[in-house]
């Protein structure tokens, strides 16, 4: 399973991904995104942590406007 970075305010997404067997890392700073296959951010404060510019190998998913299920589907597609 993938290592997924999730902003700390997205607790429902964190729980859903853990139930699917993914390793979930809480994103508190740009360094937390290192080594993640994919990162999920709220999108409310665009690029507040600099993750959009970070050199992570995975993609960044913006959760704004998506349900928890839709976010989980995006993770499955992108990882």
UniProtKB/Swiss-Prot annotation:
InterPro entries for the chain: UPF0180
Domain of life: Bacteria
Disulfide bonds: none
Pfam family, one: UPF0180
HAMAP family found in the cross-reference section: UPF0180 (MF_00506)
Family: Belongs to the UPF0180 family.
Protein name in the entry: UPF0180 protein BCG9842_B3897
Native source species: Bacillus cereus (strain G9842)
